Amino acid sequence: MLTAINHEVQPEAMQCIINPLNSAGAIGYADQAYNPSSIFEAVCKNKIPTLAIRAVQAGALTSSMDRKPHESGYDQLDFDDYLKAEPFRDIAKEWGVSPAKLAHRYALSVSGISSVILGVKNRKELNECVEAEGDEKLTDEEIKILQNLF
């Protein structure tokens, strides 16, 4: 990916994983050393428009997972991330918002993001995302607090 980003003929736009966990979860299975932040940094350096994906990291940054782990174990990293994200849920509660809304506000607040691609399953989730878009952006300090949780 970095080769394409740094090539003389660059992509018109890039989808980048943007979440406080800095995790691709189960979709990062092909490369254990995958680091979403390094991809995003290269995209920003090259001034490539960025579409944020995985804001709630397959449910890991929500109040509860909406499914059970698949028997094959292919999505285990998403469930591992859910457990890891407990401090994030604590901060969301302290700040008076749902974890999903806070995760979307985070993605919308990161400098260099052109748009956030949503993965919603119902109208309630969609409404929460629309509300997050209407809220003030997180401050740099709030962003750092969330990033430093992990």
State the predicted function of each range.
Residues 1-150:
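Beta/alpha (TIM)-barrel catalytic core signal, keyed to glycine-rich beta->alpha loops juxtaposed to Asp/Glu
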